[in-house]
């Protein structure tokens, strides 16, 4: 199948970054969304896109805006919005035509402080890991708010299995960013807000940051869990 990636950061020449790319399985570039090297909040721009997923009908959904998680007061949020920072979900047709967006930096339902990961379930609901607000927000495909989950920590990546289990990797919980919580992988039934399993990070003498910065997660058909880690380590 095709591979989608978010090109989050801008290069020094400002000729790359703030884009979403679609590649074939052989690496051929098929589509690019966003304006290369230019951050913004217009329909043809991204400002640090975090994740991309395709919906049941082929529509494209992008979680846009990374720095909202650092805005912890109403004053900071207002200043961030005024400066052009984003916290939104953007929807495009399968051919890349902009359809709509929803959300801004904030704490209400339908607002985000760093929407960091996306996943669809078998019912076509969109799950958004709202990392800065320590929750998962659930929407229909038109952006209407449905529900929330609060048991998964400060979430960087999510994965939903065919048997309706939710896996969420928490890379940032600590005594300063999310007191009384620890990082690791939390597992729970999709339609309930409770945890039934936990995979803690593991120690390594040679790699002191191991297990401390998990950004993405996947589960294969045999139940094996894969986690991508960065920037200070390479893999779980």
Question: What residues fall within each predicted segment?
Answer:
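Eukaryotic scaffold repeat domains enriched in small/polar residues
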Residues: 1-236
